[in-house]
Amino acid sequence: MLRLIALLLLLPAVLRAEVYLFDAPSGAVTDELVIYSTLDQRLAEPLIAGFQAENPGIAVRYEDLLTGDINARVTAETDAGGVTADFVFSSGMDLQVKLANDGYARPVRVPQAAGWPRWANWRDTAYAMTFEPAVLVYHKPSFPDGPPLTRIALLDYLTAAGDAMRGRIGTYDIERAAVGYLFLARDQEHFADIWSLVRAMGAANVQQFPTSQQILERVSDGRLTLGYNILGSYAADWARSHPDLGLVLLRDFTVVISRVALVPRAARRPDLGEAFLSFFMSRAGQTILAEKLRLPAVSLEVSGSNSAQAMQAALGPQLRPVAVSPGLLVYLDQAKRQRLITRWHRTLEGR
């Protein structure tokens, strides 16, 4: 049985956490696994159910937190000499790698690690678990002949459309949406004309939003006709129930990001954290991820359409996955971050 047991405001940091308890299926609790995660509890339920089916004596305490709050809690609890979560799963790739790089994660060599892609494993301390591309979403009725398929084509389309596209394209607010900032930073590395595209979006009065849902809602009902650099896993899920929403992986290149898992060094029960990681990386766990959570699986043992293997077979070098490595730490450099944000705003304003 699942119970919402608390809505915590954790002082002094004033971090907000929704805390859920998944009772042990056996009815006789022998252990409790503690998870900190950015994944919505509703999405996490099938994964936890699969783990508990194999481990019926284990209850799960699931704390739903923001990416920055997870980093702050693990750091603060470890530095205080106490214990922290047994397992951490976050969409904040850079912050997860920072925890591992700074010594807050323990090396875990689960059996599945031997077959894990090299880019998705950093020193057995941080593992990519999903494979999520950035996509262009579009309002199908507005594009009877199909949407732009490359960034150059998108630039040409916005330039030619002029005032007809004013206020009709959306993207993430890169100051409030970490994924939007990461996608822009990677675009800058792969696409020499990115700032020409940003200038064209600014001329079209691009609308900026902190969440994927706000963009997807507006594109699916036609208030927007395009959404740039949207997280593909959410877009694909939304498109299943909104037939007017289309999506395309731009053909010049497609940035792919991942949600990252680790077992903290100060875990209260590291053995339970390792057991959950092992299940998550197993064929069974990754199949649940792909089929029930609808998040593309990294494991090479999963070959269905919602997997890294299938996407790589179909798209090859078009895909540019972000490696789990200290290279991500550059995106946490505050001076560099501010320079990119300043350039973004100035370019949107046509300066």
Model-found features: residue ranges?
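Early extracytoplasmic/lumenal segment of secretory-pathway proteins
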Residues: A17-V97
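Extracytoplasmic ligand-binding site segments that recognize negatively charged/polar headgroups
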Residues: V34, T38-E45, V83-A85, S90-R223
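Periplasmic-binding protein-like
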Residues: R118, F131-P133, L197-G202, Q208, ...
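Conserved C-terminal helix/tail region of periplasmic/extracytoplasmic solute-binding proteins
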Residues: V322-R351
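Bacterial N-terminal signal peptides
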Residues: R3-A13
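A ligand-binding cleft/hinge motif common to bilobed small-molecule-binding domains
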Residues: D94-K98, S220, L224-D244
